[in-house]
């Protein structure tokens, strides 16, 4: 298969809402995005012909020991790497930990973990100044999209338990326990399960991941929100999401909105997730995510020439100190001393600059 970086593109297919509702009250139209790029690439390369991931022993043997260990433990990563055109782009460098000194490659081709079985592949795009940022998720398991729809229907039988749950974490626990029962992975005599869903281990882990991502997380954007190295996520309209990365600078995500209808629908669903729904009467929303990140959402073309858009500005779990800023080259010791004097004297100050500068 000829390698084309555009094969990795993930078009966010919100799908047409069927008008039905999932067990947590949300519409099923966006429960699972159709990863036409990455998943299609894997399927066309042979991974999707079975119900489990296929690992290429020759490629696996070429991986460094730490990378191979991760690829064997997280089989979706192994399958992903197995189908990469390594003869053309080479074996990705595996970084167990990303630091300021990690950006050493002239043509980036590296993988790092962000937790929860999610890995990020940063790969050079010779046609653009921004390289690709690709999320390798457990949900790449073949055949899971149809299975999710079946499970969503059966989750309706657990509506009473979900209503009785106290808070989002308890609701997620109810959903995951229900999935265990539906998939025959729990010892239960429950009569709620009308038809047990038969899954491989790869598919089961993918389903559990998707349930966490879609029911409690940020959906298709969840890997970006969970990545501690991302400072800014922006969608300026139809087209790809853009990222400001703490280490690798400006990148473009493998998530793209192909038309304004898809984007409008996603913006509405995103605003509902944070409890501040946008409407025609209230098209602009400023809010915060559970982790403290700021989010700005603009809905529709009446208030924005490019239509709906949104920006997520993330915050570091550990705030940067003044010494960190000096180390990173943001300012000099003399500048830091001058700022200290201004603050001690109660002078008015302002700081300006572009995002992620």
List PLM regions with ranges.
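N-terminal accessory targeting/assembly segments
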Residues: 2-274
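Hydrophobic anchor at the beta1->P-loop junction of P-loop NTPases
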Residues: 351
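P-loop NTP-binding catalytic core
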Residues: 235-236, 240-348
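The conserved Walker
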Residues: 354-355
């Amino acid at each position: 298969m000829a390698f084309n970086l555009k094969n990795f593109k993930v078009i966010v297919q919100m799908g047409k809402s069927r008008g039905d509702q999932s067990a947590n009250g949300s519409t099923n139209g966006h429960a699972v995005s159709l990863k036409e790029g990455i998943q299609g690439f894997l399927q066309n390369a042979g991974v999707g012909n079975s119900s489990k991931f296929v690992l290429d022993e020759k490629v696996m043997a070429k991986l460094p020991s730490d990378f191979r260990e991760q690829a064997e433990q997280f089989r979706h990563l192994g399958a992903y790497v197995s189908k990469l055109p390594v003869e053309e782009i080479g074996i990705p460098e595996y970084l167990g930990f990303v630091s300021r000194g990690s950006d050493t490659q002239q043509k980036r081709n590296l993988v790092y973990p962000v937790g929860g079985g999610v890995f990020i592949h940063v790969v050079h795009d010779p046609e653009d100044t921004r390289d690709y940022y690709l999320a390798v998720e457990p949900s790449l398991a073949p055949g899971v999209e149809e299975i999710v729809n079946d499970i969503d229907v059966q989750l309706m039988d657990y509506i009473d338990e979900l209503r009785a749950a106290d808070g989002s974490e308890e609701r997620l626990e109810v959903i995951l326990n229900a999935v265990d029962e539906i998939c025959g992975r729990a010892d239960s005599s429950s009569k709620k399960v009308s038809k047990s869903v038969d899954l491989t281990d790869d598919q089961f882990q993918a389903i559990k991941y998707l349930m966490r991502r879609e029911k409690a997380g940020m959906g298709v954007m969840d890997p970006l929100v969970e990545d501690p190295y991302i400072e800014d996520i922006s969608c300026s309209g139809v087209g790809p999401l853009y990222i400001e990365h703490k280490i690798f600078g400006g990148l473009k995500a493998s998530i793209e909105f192909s038309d304004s209808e898809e984007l409008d629908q996603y913006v509405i669903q995103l605003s509902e997730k944070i409890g501040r729904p946008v409407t025609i009467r209230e098209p602009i929303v400023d809010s915060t995510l559970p982790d403290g990140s700021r989010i700005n959402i603009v809905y529709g073309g009446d208030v924005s020439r490019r239509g709906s858009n949104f920006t997520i500005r993330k915050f570091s779990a550990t705030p940067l100190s003044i010494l960190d800023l000096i180390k990173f080259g943001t300012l000099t010791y003399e500048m830091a001393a001058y700022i200290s004097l201004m603050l001690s004297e109660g002078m008015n100050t302002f700081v300006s600059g572009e995002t992620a500068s």
